[in-house]
Curated annotation (Swiss-Prot):
This is Glyoxylate/hydroxypyruvate reductase B. HAMAP family: 2_Hacid_dh_C_GhrB. It comes from Pectobacterium carotovorum subsp. carotovorum (strain PC1). InterPro entries: D-isomer_2-hydroxyacid_DH, D-isomer_2_OHA_DH_cat_dom, D-isomer_DH_CS, D-isomer_DH_NAD-bd, Glyo/OHPyrv_Rdtase_B, NAD(P)-bd_dom_sf. Keywords: Cytoplasm, NAD, NADP, Oxidoreductase. GO terms for cellular component: cytosol; plasma membrane. Catalyzes the NADPH-dependent reduction of glyoxylate and hydroxypyruvate into glycolate and glycerate, respectively. It is found in: Cytoplasm. NCBIfam families: PRK15409.1.
Amino acid sequence: MKPSVILYKKIADDLRARLDQHFTVTELDAFPSLDHPALATAEGIIGSGGKVDKDFLQHAPRLRAASTISVGYDTFNVDALNEKGVILMHTPTVLTETVADTVLALMLASARRVVEVAERVKAGEWKGGVDSDWFGTDVHHKTIGILGMGRIGLAVAQRAHFGFSMPVLYNARRHHAEAEQRFNARHCDLDTLLAESDFLCITLPLTTETHHLIGREQLAKMKPSAILINIGRGAVVDEDALTEALVKGTIQGAGLDVFVKEPLPVDSPLLDLPNVVALPHIGSATHETRYDMAACAVDNLIAALSGEVKENCVNPQVLK
């Protein structure tokens, strides 16, 4: 008898067919409510979004594996999963290059004021030659500081170094030999990163250690001409402090793909600022990469429920 699983995100037909080969699938339009009858027999879940905590696990007594179609897993209570012996799988490798592209897009859009200037053109403000009121700042040869040198940080460093001749600084728990050898990247402490970076690029996940890592004190240490880019998690940055810094000119601008609350509320003060480029968490949102992420998540669930996990496991200790 095939294991029962819940699919709570639309995926391509061929990937759905692959799930059907291995499992009895209940497909839902959204994350299952706690009283959904399918939870009682589900051995696996696959999708993105939704809060998996102790309460959820109590309503899913047979759950053995969760496969998220994402690299981030901050909506999962990993300790609770470990306690119940539930395997958590994610998709850390397939989205690296696409998210790094998004970082560069945010850097360019913020520095050259692309969104702001395009809106002015649409509003009929382009009457003739442009003066300094329309100018932006260069990206090439500026210093990029990368906070978190994982896969995405490394891909950003590659683009910055080879594409824009940018000196690369980074802050991470340990030295990254490849970044230092290939891109002449320099490991430094956080204060140095803040003080010397023209672009501060945050690629960190959200943990208890990274929550509000960048706050009012840290923003005050940045250059007035600096631009902050965040494609990690929203709560790594204190949004109130960031808003204040952008209003006061403590820093020049921000390019943001992630926020504390998503979707970003329409009354967020960040949306009123011309020096903010705000995206709807689309760092990996290309047709190609989203397909690859779903395919990876399907393979992950099959591996987890067949006892053949070799990679992409968040909590490998439960495999022992």
